[in-house]
């Protein structure tokens, strides 16, 4: 199993960036090759998109996965999963059924070498507040997560406020349980300060300040390094990357920054996101000095 031991923040890629190309013009190995070429060492996958025959991949597919990780020197960093309580249509899953769904993903994430899961829970409103029984669901899966060394992390995404109720509830849960197997994934969209003319902006959104992340860092096990627009001189023009990354680095963050591209142009015919990802990784290399 390939290991990457660099101290401080590390560079990786969320395969969601390839959403317009994966399965059409790019294979899983093509994505791995891209990551290796840009010097990334970590990967996030979306389980139901990137795992063949999910949730029951064959032994042959799993062997192929490990072969790709070793060949391209890539660490399995974050496994994206959903607790889809609405999957049945006519009724919501019970708490027990949701726990079993989550346990299934924990086992598969462990089988593929991941230590962090981006665990998306069903939400009840535009502020992304989770269903009322989220604590019971997480508690039901915690013993298995502890046994297998998996950290479950809901994604903190725009329009969430890092000082708001949603984040506070998660932090209080961590403190109350004392668990090291539940934490946060901070999506850099929460720091976005610039929007294109005519672009829709959530009325609930107020940009967070880079320093707002400092008290949360003990609970942050992974980050989506969201980016929207890269200039030709390797700057992200909508998010204050220099301030955010420096704040995290100065305050001891050791996890991965997973590049996640959400520019609308990636769905244009013929667009290749790999070139935009390379620009982003030049930015990260310049900031991190690697």
UniProtKB/Swiss-Prot annotation:
GO MF annotation, one: metal ion binding
Cofactor comment: Can also use other divalent ions such as Ni(2+), Mg(2+), Zn(2+) and Ca(2+), but Mn(2+) is probably the native metal ion.
Binding site for Mn(2+): 155, 187, 224, 260
Record has ATP-binding as a keyword: no
Catalytic machinery residues: 157 (proton acceptor)
UniProt note on regulation of activity: Activity is strongly reduced in the presence of chelating agents.
Reaction(s) catalysed by this chain's protein: 3''-dehydroisoorientin = 1,5-anhydro-D-erythro-hex-1-en-3-ulose + luteolin; 3''-dehydroisovitexin = 1,5-anhydro-D-erythro-hex-1-en-3-ulose + apigenin
Entry keyword annotation includes Manganese: yes
Origin: domain of life: Bacteria
Cofactor or coenzyme needed: Mn(2+)
Coiled coil: none
EC number(s) from the headed UniProt entry: 4.1.99.-
Keywords from the UniProt entry: Carbohydrate metabolism, Lyase, Manganese, Metal-binding
pH dependence of function: Optimum pH is 6.0.
Subunit composition and interactions: Heterooctamer composed of four alpha subunits (DfgA) and four beta subunits (DfgB).
UniProt record similarity statement: Belongs to the C-glycoside deglycosidase alpha subunit family.
Functional summary from the UniProt entry: Carbon-carbon bond-cleaving enzyme which participates in the metabolism of C-glycosides. Acts on the C6-glycosylated compounds 3''-dehydroisoorientin (3''-oxo-homoorientin) and 3''-dehydroisovitexin (3''-oxo-isovitexin).
PANTHER family, alphabetized: BLR5974 PROTEIN (PTHR12110:SF53), HYDROXYPYRUVATE ISOMERASE (PTHR12110)
This protein's name: C-glycoside deglycosidase alpha subunit
